[in-house]
Amino acid sequence: MTDKRKDGSGKLLYCSFCGKSQHEVRKLIAGPSVYICDECVDLCNDIIREEIKEVAPHRERSALPTPHEIRRHLDDYVIGQEQAKKVLAVAVYNHYKRLRNGDSSNGIELGKSNILLIGPTGSGKTLLAETLARFLDVPFTMADATTLTEAGYVGEDVENIIQKLLQKCDYDVQKAQRGIVYIDEIDKISRKSDNPSITRDVSGEGVQQALLKLIEGTIAAVPPQGGRKHPQQEFLQVDTSKILFICGGAFAGLDKVIEQRTDTGRGIGFNATVKGSADKATEGELLSNVEPGDLIKFGLIPEFIGRLPVVATLRELSEEALIQILREPKNALTKQYQALFNLEGVELEFRDEALTAIAKKAMARKTGARGLRSIVEAALLDTMYDLPSLESVDKVVIDESVIAGQSEPLLIYGKHETQQASGE
């Protein structure tokens, strides 16, 4: 089609749909014996968009995965944490089922089930939230609770979280309202003491108060396209009651709070019960018994805990679990580096003892799965630096001594059928 103002005879042209002349519109597009103006094109686009919106909810309702399907998908990417995956699968399924049925069933209002994840660093809290959002194909954003402050103070306003979510979906409010927000380091905004303070705590209890309404459900007014707020502008209205909030934190020291509550038979003096190290519960076992009172004693306010009714605890990853993480998930770290080396036409092999050494090193650093990448990256750095300049390398082998820093990776050359260290 071409843009036409007049035909060859100089005759005045009109839109075949609305009847407006070429002088009344900005553009007139010509087809075979027919014309359409820019205004009619815009109208057609609006009609199509509205029809897509009406059809989408029915499509979504039929496509809602079951808890078993959600759990199976999490199993593909997250090793261990079986109970946490089951809790998450049920909570997420119920949340989106509530959205698809209009927040109520037979006149009964369905409550919102935000989630609190408790577990040590590198146990998979963030990965679980990211994997869920990717599987459900919903917008996802992360926020760090330590950067948040009350409105009016220097720092990040809690409403900026919603703005980040809108940015992820090009400011489509309907999409944003189906999204997932993960707030990390939530334990760092615990108040500094059990007793309410008369002084302001703008990064602790004050932030909990600011997050209350956002997490429970409110209409957040967000400036369009990330601009600053000013009285004359129109705001985007986002209903946060439809957004799933997942809060996560390590809660270091919470196990001691739980131990004090559960260890009722300690006694004093000659009546004290002496427990050996074998009798003591592990941190993971203690955290699995967490109750709202323990979180209040830790420093979260009761109102905030009430907005996070679903609690899932994650255990510290064992050496065996770390080895599985290196090898088994669909996007396992070893598979990622093997794909990277394949781009150079080189095969990368990790021997079993190398994976064990990587896991032991991560355990010693107490960084969980998060520390695995830095260990592998350090071991492969020199090889990745040299490899593009080397010819005829067919294979690179990583063993235990490479991870320990005692030798260089083994390079196997195709043409000469010799084995050399990359440093030679």
Swiss-Prot record:
Family matches, as PROSITE patterns: CLPX_ZB (PS51902)
GO CC aspect terms: HslUV protease complex
All residue ranges annotated as the ClpX-type ZB domain in the record: 2-56
Family matches, as InterPro entries: AAA+_ATPase, ATP-dep_Clp_protease_ClpX, ATPase_AAA_core, Clp_ATPase_C, Clp_protease_ATP-bd_su_ClpX, ClpX_bact, P-loop_NTPase, Znf_CppX_C4
Gene3D superfamilies: 1.10.8.60, ClpX chaperone, C4-type zinc finger domain (6.20.220.10), P-loop containing nucleotide triphosphate hydrolases (3.40.50.300)
Keywords for this protein: ATP-binding, Chaperone, Metal-binding, Nucleotide-binding, Zinc
Oligomeric and partner information: Component of the ClpX-ClpP complex. Forms a hexameric ring that, in the presence of ATP, binds to fourteen ClpP subunits assembled into a disk-like structure with a central cavity, resembling the structure of eukaryotic proteasomes.
Alphabetical list of CDD domains matching this protein: RecA-like_ClpX (cd19497)
Key word Plastid present: no
Domain of life: Bacteria
Gene Ontology terms describing biological process: cell division; proteolysis involved in protein catabolic process
Gene Ontology molecular-function annotations: ATP binding; ATP hydrolysis activity; ATP-dependent protein folding chaperone; protein dimerization activity; unfolded protein binding; zinc ion binding
Chain residues that bind ATP: P120, T121, G122, S123, G124, K125, T126, L127
Binding site for Zn(2+): C15, C18, C37, C40
Protein name as it appears in the record: ATP-dependent Clp protease ATP-binding subunit ClpX
Entry similarity comment: Belongs to the ClpX chaperone family.
Organism: Pectobacterium carotovorum subsp. carotovorum (strain PC1)
Classification via Pfam families: AAA_2, ClpB_D2-small, zf-C4_ClpX
Role, per record: ATP-dependent specificity component of the Clp protease. It directs the protease to specific substrates. Can perform chaperone functions in the absence of ClpP.
